[in-house]
């Protein structure tokens, strides 16, 4: 391993450490990710020929065509990254449109009950389902806002909020559009929508149901329902009830339609998400036509042109930085060597490899972990490493569900931590072991299905 290769690895590891300790450094992880991107590729360009000879042995252009070749490599990686970024931007915008225009109002009505345990199960399954359709971050925000209207006791709400984290991560693991990591794997063609839903659905349910069974022992009695003011009920007044339902079904139904669109047209998933965004945008413009005409009413601030500014661009830039930095590691051969090393150490046991990756995803960000694995292991024509093979499906499950073990291990956990003021220590003491039990139970369930049911 050359000094230059070691330098690139040091830049990546240092950046990774700063991202993992964002809560301590108070430096936004997107800024660090962008610096990682630039730092890694700048070092790469100091002597790209050694890496071209290593990773592209068919290259014969010599020094004269070196810059052009490297530029093409970077553009190819950027193209792959852009498909994920456009998908995320489209999905985030769609959810923002539905939320801001009252599309989720019906959820609060569905959740109403006096029994604490009944509410827990409604929260668990609704969060699970919504997270499979939306992203787990948005689902968590929506569910916490609903919980605040239903549960007044903060101690009880922390238990419910913890279940929201677990259910959101479990629900996102089996859906090709439910979590950033599954989006990455699906977008890359490593898993299919039908395959991951069919084989990861039951383990995901198990990883949510078992923690819910344990958590319900912490809740007894009935809820004291808070009063809902007329002003709160009238928070969304621009659209009629029918129009709000139309916005919901166009948005959420459209997200469900994306995998179907991909299977019919064979176009990348981001094309389907842009189709849904275009249709939903057009529909809301038609609904707003004639409303607040000639005025500066507050409702016009909910039009898509205004809502676009609310999309979290720092998240998009974070993924750009991470994915492009990981692509640099792939181009210097580090990921291939690491993947071979893991196979040797664990003797090719994919359950152990992915299980450890899942535990690591609760400590550090799962996006670079999954991106790294995508670069470490080539897709095989058949076997465990083939499309929809054991390794890729387990990676989708472990990277998603594993993030529940620590409150900082997932985007859902971080946002709930901030909204409900749950401390790292409280979650680790009361919830982490419960999430771990569910995580292991899901892996065992997957092993049982693959070993015994598939053998019949």
Per-region residue spans from a language model:
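Interfacial loop-to-helix junctions that mark the boundaries of transmembrane helices
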Residues: 1-4, 24-27, 55-59, 67-84, ...
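Juxtamembrane and boundary regions of transmembrane helices in multi-pass small-molecule transporters
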Residues: 4-7, 153-154, 158, 174-175, ...
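Hydrophobic mid-bilayer segments of alpha-helices in multi-pass membrane transport proteins
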Residues: 6-15, 26-62, 81-93, 244-254, ...
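Hydrophobic alpha-helical transmembrane segments
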Residues: 6-9, 34-35, 85, 120-125, ...
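Membrane-interfacial helix-loop connectors
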Residues: 40-51, 78-79, 130-167, 171, ...
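Transmembrane alpha-helix boundary signature
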Residues: 43-76, 92-109, 129-141, 328, ...
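Transmembrane helical segments that form the transport core of multi-pass membrane transport proteins
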Residues: 60, 79, 101, 108-110, ...
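Alpha-helical transmembrane segments
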Residues: 79-89, 195-213, 265-278, 352, ...
């Amino acid at each position: 391993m050359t000094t230059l290769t070691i330098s690139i690895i040091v830049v990546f590891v240092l950046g990774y450490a700063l991202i993992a300790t964002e809560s301590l450094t108070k430096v936004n992880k997107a800024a660090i990710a962008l610096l990682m991107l630039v730092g890694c590729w700048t070092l790469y360009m100091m002597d790209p020929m050694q890496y071209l000879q290593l990773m592209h042995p068919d290259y014969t252009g010599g020094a004269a065509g070196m810059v052009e070749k490297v530029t093409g490599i970077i553009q190819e990686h950027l193209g792959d990254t852009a498909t994920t970024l456009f998908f995320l931007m489209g999905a985030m915008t769609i959810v923002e449109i539905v939320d801001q225009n009252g599309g989720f109002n019906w959820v609060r009505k569905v959740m109403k009950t006096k029994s604490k345990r009944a509410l827990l199960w409604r929260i668990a399954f609704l969060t699970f389902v919504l997270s499979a359709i939306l992203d787990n971050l948005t689902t968590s925000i929506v569910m916490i806002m609903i919980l605040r209207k239903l549960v007044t006791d903060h101690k009880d709400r922390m238990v419910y909020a913890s279940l929201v984290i677990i259910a959101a991560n479990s629900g996102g693991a089996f859906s090709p559009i439910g979590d950033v990591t599954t989006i990455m794997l699906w977008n890359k063609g490593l898993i299919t929508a039908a395959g991951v839903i069919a084989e990861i659905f039951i383990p995901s349910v198990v990883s949510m149901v078992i923690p819910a069974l344990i958590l319900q022992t912490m809740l007894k009695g009935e809820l004291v329902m808070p009063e809902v003011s007329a002003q709160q009920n009238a928070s969304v007044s621009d659209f009629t009830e029918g129009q709000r339902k139309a916005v919901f079904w166009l948005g959420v139904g459209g997200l469900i339609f994306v995998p179907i669109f991909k299977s019919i047209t064979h176009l990348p998933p981001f094309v389907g998400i842009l189709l849904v965004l275009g249709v939903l945008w057009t529909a809301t413009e038609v609904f707003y036509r004639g409303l607040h005409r000639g005025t500066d009413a507050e409702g016009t601030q909910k039009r898509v042109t205004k809502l676009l500014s609310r999309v979290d661009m720092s998240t998009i830039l974070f993924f750009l930085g991470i994915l492009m930095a990981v692509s640099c590691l792939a181009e210097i051969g580090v990921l291939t060597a690491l993947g071979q090393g893991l196979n040797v150490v664990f003797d090719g046991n994919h359950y152990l490899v992915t299980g450890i990756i899942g535990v690591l995803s609760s400590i550090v960000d799962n996006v670079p972990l999954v991106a790294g694995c995508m670069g470490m292991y080539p897709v095989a024509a058949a076997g465990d490493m083939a499309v929809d093979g054991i390794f890729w499906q387990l990676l989708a499950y472990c990277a998603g569900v594993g993030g529940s073990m620590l409150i900082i291990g997932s985007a859902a956990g971080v946002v709930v931590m901030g909204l409900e003021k749950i401390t790292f220590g409280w979650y680790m003491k009361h919830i982490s072991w419960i999430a771990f039990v569910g995580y292991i139970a899901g892996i065992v369930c997957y092993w049982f299905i693959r070993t015994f049911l598939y053998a019949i």
